[in-house]
A protein has these predicted regions:
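Conserved class I S-adenosyl-L-methionine
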Residues: 39-49
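A short glycine-rich, Lys/Arg-flanked "PGG" loop and its adjoining helix->strand segment in the class I
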Residues: 129-145
Length: 210
């Protein structure tokens, strides 16, 4: 496991730029590389606290766009075009409220979700797989045709199966690592593009998407 370095260069950059977390640079890098969102777009951010990704997304979509975040923890005020909803992603009513606040389908869904690790490999892998499945189910309900999903993933015994499931819903799926990820970290990101609207799901309860 990578040694935690609380004051690495990305920590310093985040503090200097007034960002809420160093994780903001991960999303910024991905958006610059893949061009997944445009001005005026609608975006949903899953697990949005403390708000680092919300700020990057707010800037990306501009004043005419809208960003909705969901998290159990409060995010506080980010920007006029950002709405943060408190709630559990497993609750279908929460996803429904997010769709209502968005005012229409989303061009992009983002997820930096990760479970609290127990050190028990099988349990941790199952918890991460559940979060990815929830993210995919919500995206399948909310994304517009051709939309995209960014989701954190760790290397595990479930890795290939998870990626294969994403490929059922998107024409283009790849896995990338960001420079802002800590050295030695197992953290990767799934970049899923060109959503098949015919695969739209009504299931946001964490059950397997089909």
């Amino acid at each position: 496991m990578a040694k935690y370095q609380p004051r690495d260069k990305y920590f310093q950059k985040a503090r200097a730029q007034g960002l809420r977390s160093r994780a903001a640079f991960k999303l910024s890098e991905i958006l610059q590389r893949y061009r997944l969102v445009t001005r005026g777009a609608r975006v949903l951010d899953l697990g949005c606290a403390p708000g680092g990704w919300l700020k990057i997304l707010s800037d990306a979509v501009g004043a005419q766009g809208r960003v909705v975040g969901i998290d159990l923890a409060a995010c506080g005020s980010i920007a006029p075009n950002v709405i943060a909803i408190g709630g559990d992603l497993r609750d279908a009513a929460v996803a429904g409220a997010a769709l209502e606040r968005l005012g229409g389908s989303a061009a992009l869904v983002t997820s930096d979700l990760a479970p609290k690790l127990t050190g028990i490999r099988a349990r941790d892998e199952a918890a991460m797989a559940e979060l990815l499945n929830i993210s995919l189910a919500i995206a399948a309900r909310i994304l517009q045709p051709g939309g995209a999903l960014i989701a954190k993933i760790f290397m595990s015994s479930e890795f290939k199966a998870i990626v294969a499931n994403f490929e059922r819903y998107f024409n283009h799926v790849e896995v990338t690592r960001t420079e802002a990820s800590r050295p030695g970290s197992a953290e990767l990101y799934i970049i899923a593009r060109d959503f098949h609207s015919s695969r739209r799901s009504q299931d946001t309860t964490g059950g397997e998407v089909s």
